[in-house]
Amino acid sequence: MTAQTPIHVYSEIGKLKKVLLHRPGKEIENLMPDYLERLLFDDIPFLEDAQKEHDAFAQALRDEGIEVLDLETLAAESLGTPEIREAFIDEYLSEANIRGRATKKAIRELLMAIEDNQELIEKTMAGVQKSELPEIPASEKGLTDLVESNYPFAIDPMPNLYFTRDPFATIGTGVSLNHMFSETRNRETLYGKYIFTHHPIYGGGKVPMVYDRNETTRIEGGDELVLSKDVLAVGISQRTDAASIEKLLVNIFKQNLGFKKVLAFEFANNRKFMHLDTVFTMVDYDKFTIHPEIEGDLRVYSVTYDNEELHIVEEKGDLAELLAANLGVEKVDLIRCGGDNLVAAGREQWNDGSNTLTIAPGVVVVYNRNTITNAILESKGLKLIKIHGSELVRGRGGPRCMSMPFEREDI
């Protein structure tokens, strides 16, 4: 990394030097059973224990010499002037789907009154309950204020924020600032916008943008994997459109970030396989985790760029051989989540047994609960750093989902 290129990520496995996390906060306590589906959760984590688990995750990374950055801190540091701060508040409000004019005015006054930038950022993440606002005089209420009185939130919380992998993705020296699948999560990308526009280290045009949050088609970071300095992998999934991938790839190739080919993986479109990294991650030079249930239906396309056009070829044959050829290794070992047992594979994939974070070649952070997959990984010679995640996993994400590398050593 240099002062000119504060982002440097050219693999999934190079020694991790710097990573972005978000410690779960009050946004988790604003989850309610009646609105879980709306907020993309299946259950409600116990915040106190989720924070302990996340703190242990962050400490495990620090113990390996990795610098841990906090999303809320970087976002707060990006609000460097009163003008930027006010612009952030206004943009946040415009995207918050606030239904009543009087309600919007009251929330703006609440946010403008928060003097500390970090406190302001944390409040925008937590959401705003209607009970926090002063009573609006009947004479000032619009029709929306009157008829939507039962829903408890004036602004929804953002409980998925601890999955920092998805709102934006670091690719080479650039960043894909994503347009996300759901309105609930798309608001999360606002923090990335301000970080990469206004932060003293990461803003000011120092980081090339290869996708824009204002695009109309959707893409998420869990579907963006950097296999090597030459090859990317992208997933066509529940959360990422093929059209978005084409836009992303044209931008990557045009900006000469160094990549020569992209492997596009098309697989089952459902919640349990929501991203490529929930079923497929790289753990060593020649080893990948994979969920066996996707192998039969998986289609892979090779994408290159020449004469200002994308050239797309559907690949046939064995996936391991395809990966080996593209990575320049003799053989690739596809390590099945849960082994060959269908029940174990389903259970451990649901608990993110395939969603590993590689912090150096052959050194992998995993949830300790996926005992069968972990034993198989260890039998293959991998060093595992096991973390507790009984509460964190309720959000349906593992160590890779909860981390966004900012700097890796080259391999």
Swiss-Prot record:
Keywords: Arginine metabolism, Cytoplasm, Hydrolase. One of its GO terms (molecular function) is arginine deiminase activity. Pathway: Amino-acid degradation; L-arginine degradation via ADI pathway; carbamoyl phosphate from L-arginine: step 1/2. It catalyses: L-arginine + H2O = L-citrulline + NH4(+). It is found in: Cytoplasm. Its main location: cytoplasm. GO terms for biological process: arginine catabolic process to ornithine; arginine deiminase pathway. Signal peptide: none annotated. InterPro entries: Arg_deiminase. The active site is at residue 401. GO terms for cellular component: cytoplasm. Pfam families: ADI. Disulfide bonds: none annotated. Its EC number is 3.5.3.6. NCBIfam families: arcA, PRK01388.1. Belongs to the arginine deiminase family. This is Arginine deiminase. It comes from Streptococcus pyogenes serotype M49 (strain NZ131). The gene is arcA.
